[in-house]
Amino acid sequence: MEELVGLLRIRVKRGINLAQRDTLSSDPFVVITMGSQKLKTRVVENNCNPEWNEELTLALRHPDEPVNLIVYDKDTFTSHDKMGDAKIDIKPFLEVHKMGLQELPDGTEIKRVVPNRENCLAEASSIVSNNGKIVQNMILLLRNVECGEVEIQLEWIDIPGSRGL
């Protein structure tokens, strides 16, 4: 069995202007996958601007493994409708974490990541110091859908005794 590097906590905050998949609205939920790990939020019924505010934690063994986010519309009698997807680019976040800058004053911006073809950012994203931790807030532009964004926050959790990053 491969050794854990650490834990990646993803706070799935909210959806913004998600696509309508049912008659009047949608019943969205988020699925995050990394390798064989698959985590999901609760369903928010009848809402194209849902507030999840849920923490999903992935065990990281391979820092280069892609992290994917997919939004679905829950359907009771048929398969769930896909409402878009995004790749979460964690590389800049992990690079900053390796610098060991957790002791900076709260709110200090360490790095700014701009949208490009390699990430799904809707706007520039800041990696900042927050209560002795490094966090990154992002708004992801969903792909393969007519509209929609998802706001998330990344946070790294060290595991005592692990090899770390």
UniProtKB/Swiss-Prot annotation:
In the UniProt record, does the keyword Transmembrane helix occur? no
Q: Which residues carry this modification: N-acetylmethionine?
A: 1
Which GO BP terms sit in this record?
A: abscisic acid-activated signaling pathway; positive regulation of abscisic acid-activated signaling pathway; positive regulation of GTPase activity
Among its keywords, does the record have Acetylation?
A: yes
Q: Extract the InterPro entries matched here.
A: C2_dom, C2_domain_sf, CAR1-11
Instruction: Give GO terms: molecular function aspect only.
Output: GTPase activator activity; metal ion binding; phospholipid binding
Subcellular location as annotated: Cell membrane; Nucleus
Record keywords: Abscisic acid signaling pathway, Acetylation, Calcium, Cell membrane, GTPase activation, Lipid-binding, Membrane, Metal-binding, Nucleus
Instruction: Using the record's annotation, list all stretches that form the C2 domain.
Output: 1-106
Primary localization class, coarse: membrane
Which amino acid positions bind Ca(2+) 1, per UniProt?
21-22, 73, 75, 81
* Positions annotated to bind Ca(2+) 2: 22, 27, 73-75
By sequence similarity, the record places it as follows: Belongs to the plant CAR protein family.
Oligomeric state and interaction partners are given as: Binds to PYR/PYL/RCAR abscisic acid intracellular receptors in an ABA-independent manner, both at the plasma membrane and in the nucleus.
- Known function: Stimulates the GTPase/ATPase activities of Obg-like ATPases. Mediates the transient calcium-dependent interaction of PYR/PYL/RCAR abscisic acid (ABA) receptors with the plasma membrane and thus regulates ABA sensitivity.
Output this protein's name: Protein C2-DOMAIN ABA-RELATED 7
